[in-house]
Protein backbone atom coordinates (compact mmCIF):
# COMPACT_ATOMS: atom_id res chain seq x y z
CA UNK A 1 0.00 0.00 0.00
CA UNK A 2 1.33 3.46 -0.76
CA UNK A 3 2.41 5.00 2.52
CA UNK A 4 0.33 7.76 4.01
CA UNK A 5 -2.96 6.39 2.73
CA UNK A 6 -5.41 5.49 5.47
CA UNK A 7 -6.06 1.77 5.69
CA UNK A 8 -9.12 2.20 7.88
CA UNK A 9 -12.41 2.55 6.03
CA UNK A 10 -15.36 4.86 6.70
CA UNK A 11 -17.46 4.32 9.79
CA UNK A 12 -14.68 4.64 12.36
CA UNK A 13 -14.56 7.14 15.23
CA UNK A 14 -14.42 10.81 14.24
CA UNK A 15 -14.75 12.41 17.68
CA UNK A 16 -11.63 14.04 19.12
CA UNK A 17 -9.75 11.83 21.57
CA UNK A 18 -9.37 12.63 25.23
CA UNK A 19 -5.91 12.56 26.81
CA UNK A 20 -6.80 9.19 28.40
CA UNK A 21 -7.85 7.75 25.02
CA UNK A 22 -4.62 8.98 23.42
CA UNK A 23 -2.57 7.47 26.25
CA UNK A 24 -4.49 4.17 25.92
CA UNK A 25 -3.78 4.07 22.18
CA UNK A 26 -0.09 4.88 22.64
CA UNK A 27 0.18 2.16 25.30
CA UNK A 28 -1.58 -0.30 22.98
CA UNK A 29 0.96 0.35 20.23
CA UNK A 30 3.84 0.05 22.72
CA UNK A 31 2.38 -3.13 24.21
CA UNK A 32 2.08 -4.73 20.78
CA UNK A 33 5.46 -3.64 19.42
CA UNK A 34 7.81 -1.29 21.26
CA UNK A 35 10.18 -1.13 18.27
CA UNK A 36 7.76 0.68 15.94
CA UNK A 37 7.20 4.42 16.26
CA UNK A 38 3.57 5.48 16.63
CA UNK A 39 2.34 8.98 17.36
CA UNK A 40 -0.96 10.81 17.61
CA UNK A 41 -2.03 13.59 15.25
CA UNK A 42 -5.55 14.87 15.87
CA UNK A 43 -5.93 16.02 12.25
CA UNK A 44 -4.75 12.78 10.62
CA UNK A 45 -6.45 9.63 9.54
CA UNK A 46 -4.62 6.60 10.85
CA UNK A 47 -1.98 5.36 8.42
CA UNK A 48 1.54 4.03 8.11
CA UNK A 49 3.96 6.63 6.72
CA UNK A 50 7.39 6.33 5.17
CA UNK A 51 9.55 9.39 5.81
CA UNK A 52 12.69 10.17 3.81
CA UNK A 53 15.13 12.50 5.53
CA UNK A 54 18.81 13.32 5.02
CA UNK A 55 19.71 10.96 7.87
CA UNK A 56 17.78 8.11 6.25
CA UNK A 57 14.37 6.60 5.67
CA UNK A 58 12.11 5.49 8.50
CA UNK A 59 8.57 4.24 8.98
CA UNK A 60 6.03 5.44 11.50
CA UNK A 61 2.36 4.90 12.28
CA UNK A 62 0.51 8.18 12.65
CA UNK A 63 -2.87 7.67 14.25
CA UNK A 64 -5.88 9.90 14.56
CA UNK A 65 -9.29 9.57 16.19
CA UNK A 66 -10.20 6.79 13.72
CA UNK A 67 -7.89 4.36 15.54
CA UNK A 68 -11.00 3.67 17.65
CA UNK A 69 -14.06 1.92 16.19
CA UNK A 70 -17.10 3.94 15.20
CA UNK A 71 -20.51 3.86 16.83
CA UNK A 72 -22.26 2.39 13.81
CA UNK A 73 -20.99 -0.84 12.39
CA UNK A 74 -20.93 -0.34 8.62
CA UNK A 75 -18.44 -3.10 7.83
CA UNK A 76 -15.87 -5.29 9.62
CA UNK A 77 -13.20 -2.60 9.35
CA UNK A 78 -15.34 0.00 11.13
CA UNK A 79 -15.77 -2.43 14.05
CA UNK A 80 -12.07 -3.25 14.50
CA UNK A 81 -11.11 -2.70 18.13
CA UNK A 82 -8.22 -0.47 19.14
CA UNK A 83 -6.05 -3.60 19.54
CA UNK A 84 -6.96 -4.99 16.11
CA UNK A 85 -6.56 -1.64 14.33
CA UNK A 86 -3.18 -1.07 16.00
CA UNK A 87 -2.02 -4.59 15.07
CA UNK A 88 -3.09 -3.95 11.47
CA UNK A 89 -1.18 -0.65 11.27
CA UNK A 90 1.93 -2.09 12.91
CA UNK A 91 1.84 -4.90 10.36
CA UNK A 92 1.96 -2.28 7.60
CA UNK A 93 5.27 -1.18 9.10
CA UNK A 94 6.65 -4.73 9.07
CA UNK A 95 5.45 -5.36 5.49
CA UNK A 96 7.20 -2.12 4.45
CA UNK A 97 10.41 -3.02 6.34
CA UNK A 98 10.43 -6.56 4.90
CA UNK A 99 9.67 -5.23 1.38
CA UNK A 100 6.52 -7.35 1.10
CA UNK A 101 4.04 -4.44 0.89
CA UNK A 102 2.25 -4.08 -2.44
CA UNK A 103 2.92 -0.47 -3.39
CA UNK A 104 0.73 -0.29 -6.50
CA UNK A 105 -2.53 1.68 -6.15
CA UNK A 106 -4.50 -0.98 -8.02
CA UNK A 107 -3.39 -3.60 -5.47
CA UNK A 108 -4.40 -1.55 -2.41
CA UNK A 109 -7.29 -3.81 -1.33
CA UNK A 110 -5.17 -6.93 -1.82
CA UNK A 111 -2.38 -5.39 0.28
CA UNK A 112 -4.91 -4.50 3.00
CA UNK A 113 -6.26 -8.06 3.04
CA UNK A 114 -2.77 -9.50 3.37
CA UNK A 115 -1.97 -7.00 6.12
CA UNK A 116 -5.02 -7.99 8.18
CA UNK A 117 -4.19 -11.69 7.82
CA UNK A 118 -0.53 -11.17 8.71
CA UNK A 119 -1.55 -9.07 11.73
CA UNK A 120 -3.31 -12.15 13.10
CA UNK A 121 -0.16 -14.24 12.84
CA UNK A 122 2.18 -11.54 14.13
CA UNK A 123 0.07 -10.44 17.12
CA UNK A 124 -2.19 -13.44 17.79
CA UNK A 125 -1.25 -13.75 21.46
CA UNK A 126 -2.30 -10.11 22.03
CA UNK A 127 -5.62 -10.32 20.17
CA UNK A 128 -8.96 -11.59 21.42
CA UNK A 129 -10.92 -14.19 19.47
CA UNK A 130 -13.27 -11.40 18.39
CA UNK A 131 -10.35 -9.30 17.11
CA UNK A 132 -9.06 -12.25 15.09
CA UNK A 133 -12.49 -12.82 13.54
CA UNK A 134 -12.88 -9.13 12.70
CA UNK A 135 -9.45 -9.05 11.04
CA UNK A 136 -10.41 -12.12 8.98
CA UNK A 137 -13.73 -10.47 8.05
CA UNK A 138 -11.84 -7.30 7.10
CA UNK A 139 -9.52 -9.35 4.87
CA UNK A 140 -12.49 -11.07 3.20
CA UNK A 141 -14.16 -7.72 2.56
CA UNK A 142 -10.94 -6.29 1.11
CA UNK A 143 -10.65 -9.29 -1.22
CA UNK A 144 -14.25 -8.73 -2.31
CA UNK A 145 -13.47 -5.04 -2.96
CA UNK A 146 -10.39 -6.06 -4.96
CA UNK A 147 -12.42 -8.47 -7.12
CA UNK A 148 -15.17 -5.87 -7.62
CA UNK A 149 -12.56 -3.28 -8.62
CA UNK A 150 -11.03 -5.68 -11.16
CA UNK A 151 -14.45 -6.63 -12.56
CA UNK A 152 -15.32 -2.96 -12.98
CA UNK A 153 -12.09 -2.32 -14.89
CA UNK A 154 -12.77 -5.30 -17.16
CA UNK A 155 -16.37 -4.16 -17.77
CA UNK A 156 -15.21 -0.66 -18.68
CA UNK A 157 -12.56 -2.03 -21.03
CA UNK A 158 -15.08 -4.38 -22.68
CA UNK A 159 -17.56 -1.50 -23.00
CA UNK A 160 -14.93 0.64 -24.70
CA UNK A 161 -14.09 -2.20 -27.10
CA UNK A 162 -17.77 -2.72 -27.96
CA UNK A 163 -18.27 1.01 -28.45
CA UNK A 164 -15.30 1.09 -30.83
CA UNK A 165 -16.76 -1.78 -32.87
CA UNK A 166 -20.20 -0.17 -33.24
CA UNK A 167 -18.82 3.04 -34.71
Where are these regions (language model features)?
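Active-site scaffold of zinc-dependent metalloenzymes
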Residues: 39-83, 93-97
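Short amphipathic alpha-helical segments that mediate assembly, nucleic-acid/protein binding
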Residues: 19-23, 110-113, 132-136
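Second-shell loop/turn segments in exported
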Residues: 10-15, 73-76, 104-106
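Catalytic Zn2+-binding segment of zinc metalloproteases
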Residues: 89-106
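A metal-dependent hydrolase signature that marks the N-terminal structural subdomain at the beginning
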Residues: 1-46, 156, 160-163
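Long, well-structured alpha-helical subdomains associated
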Residues: 108, 120-167
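Active-site catalytic microenvironments for nucleophilic, acid-base chemistry
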Residues: 93, 97, 118-125
